[in-house]
Regions:
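Ser/Thr-rich, low-complexity intrinsically disordered terminal regions
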Residues: 17-207
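Bacterial Sec-dependent N-terminal signal peptides
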Residues: 1-21, 194
């Protein structure tokens, strides 16, 4: 597990995007040798290439702003099992001459086509640093209690549920480390895909 923690720390430091001011998403300003019009065109091309139906995901498309609502796949581990999720998110592109800003904000989570009631499952991943085991367990405890309370559980039932939950959480921190790595890679891949597409030279596009 020590090697996994070290790898995560090294990987996270290599990311260009940062948490936004409200700590609920990611942001990055990218400088390019392109006009505002060229940036706008390439961003629209990227959306068309990466989404099944660009028309259904684009919420706003003006010369200086492009807003896209979509989702990406994310696998999360729980003990020895891995479950597929879809992370709904809003991508906002702000455009100027020679630079653009990417804002990515997760807005929801679903599993097998069903929306989950809360973002608490992934909020633990939107952090500027890797949580220590102690920090994670405190956050996990708070999240679980809030979840049970939102389901109308009494204090007595919450305590009973917490005891039951603790018996199944022996690998919880290790799961967090794996899931955090998957999360960070998914976010980083999205930003990298956008930047790589806009950095394509005209020579690469010639045919």
């Amino acid at each position: 597990m020590k090697n996994l923690i070290i790898a995560l720390l090294i990987t996270f430091k290599g990311y260009s995007q940062q948490l936004n001011r409200t700590n609920d998403g990611y942001t990055e300003v990218v400088e390019v040798e392109l006009s505002k019009k060229e940036i706008h065109q390439k961003l629209n091309e990227w959306v068309a290439v990466n989404y099944k139906s660009a028309n259904s995901v684009v919420q706003l498309n003006t010369e200086d702003k492009l807003i896209v609502k979509g989702n990406f796949a994310l696998s999360l581990s729980v003990t020895k099992y891995t479950f597929p999720y879809r992370i709904n998110n809003t991508l906002t592109f702000s455009i100027r001459d020679n630079k653009y800003k990417i804002d990515l904000a997760p807005t929801g989570i679903s599993s097998e086509g069903k929306s989950l009631s809360s973002l608490s499952l992934i909020n633990r991943f939107i952090k500027s640093k890797l949580l220590s085991k102690e920090e994670y367990l405190v956050l996990n405890d708070e999240t679980a209690r809030k979840s049970f309370a939102s389901m109308g559980y009494s204090e007595k039932k919450i305590e009973k549920s917490m005891k039951t939950l603790s018996r199944y959480n022996k690998t919880d921190y290790e799961d967090y480390l794996k899931n955090k790595a998957n999360w960070d890679n998914a976010i980083n891949s999205t930003f990298k895909s956008i930047k790589d597409y806009l950095n394509k030279s005209k020579t690469e596009e010639d045919w």
